[in-house]
Structures are given as C-alpha cells and as structure tokens.
Amino acid sequence: NFDIHVISRTCRTYNVQGYYIIHPLEVQKQIIDKILSYWQEGYGKVYNPDRADALSRVLWQPDIASAVQTIAERTGKQPYVVTTDARIYPNTVSYSFMRKQLQEGDRPVLLLFGTGFGIEAETMAKFDYILEPVYGPCDYNHLCVRSAAAIILDRLAGEAWWEKN
C-alpha cells in the first residue's frame, strides 16, 4: 500500500506516464484495485484529490511482457526495458546515458524496480539496459524501492541543477 502511494506520487512529480505494478497473482490485482478504488472513487478522492491524480497512472500487469506490450500499443513503439540493481552487469549504463536516451531518443522506456529479492539474473540478462547502482558515501547500497525510485527518477527526469550557476 505504501509503495503504491509513495511511488505513484514520485511518478506524478516526474511526469511518468504509467506506473506498472507487475505481479502474477490475481489476488494482488484485487488488492491494488481496492486501494485505487478507495483513492479514486471513494472517500479518499474527496479527502485527498492530489493522491487520486497521482494514482491515476497506476496499472497492474501480470508480467513484464504484458507491460511491454501495453506500452508498445499505447505509443506505437517498442520500449527499452531498463532495470536497476546494486551490482554491475555487462549492459550496465550510467544515469547520464539513460537521461540522454529519455530526452533525445524516440522510444519509450519501461523502468523496472525489483522488490524483496529483486529480479532474477536470468531475466535481467534479457533487458536492454541496467542502470548503475546508486552509491552513497559508503559501501552500503541496499535502498528500499521507494527511496531508489525517487533518487533514480530524479537523476533521469529531474531538474539539471548541476548545469545552473
């Protein structure tokens, strides 16, 4: 519930067009639908209309392939599939590379965040890119998904504060 609220607000702040929650179990979809219904149609919409706006971009998909297909149908273009990890892979790219792809490229991006045990290495090997880890000032880099999403979306779509005088 908190991940849905917090990440949807972060996505809305950075103008992400869709926040896909990918999970194969129908019971998870029912939970998501119940949460969304409360905030978009129930008392929650009256209580906090901004949250209803942020949650309007949340979509459930049973698997990654379905999310890719939905994005391709919506945009007419096959998205890059990009994920994050605390480790380096052969297809790891920098935030500046991916930011440039988003600004200048003509393909949408499906950015995946794993939770719990993350995404299986075999699955990750099939993705177009893996973003470099988020490094802090020490060797610990195991962020919760909410923090990682906020930091990474800011790096990819936020204000280029470092270019200002």
Where are these regions (language model features)?
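RNA substrate-binding interface of SAM-dependent RNA methyltransferases
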Residues: 1-85, 150-153, 157, 161
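Conserved acidic residues
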Residues: 17, 79, 108-109, 128
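Structured adenosyl-cofactor binding patch, chiefly the S-adenosyl-L-methionine
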Residues: 117-165
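Short, glycine/charged-enriched secondary-structure capping and boundary segments
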Residues: 34-36, 95-99, 125-128, 146
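A short acidic, often aromatic-flanked loop/helix-cap motif at beta-alpha or helix-coil junctions
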Residues: 64-69, 89-90, 137-140
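Residues that form or flank phosphate/diphosphate-binding pockets in enzymes
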Residues: 30, 93, 140
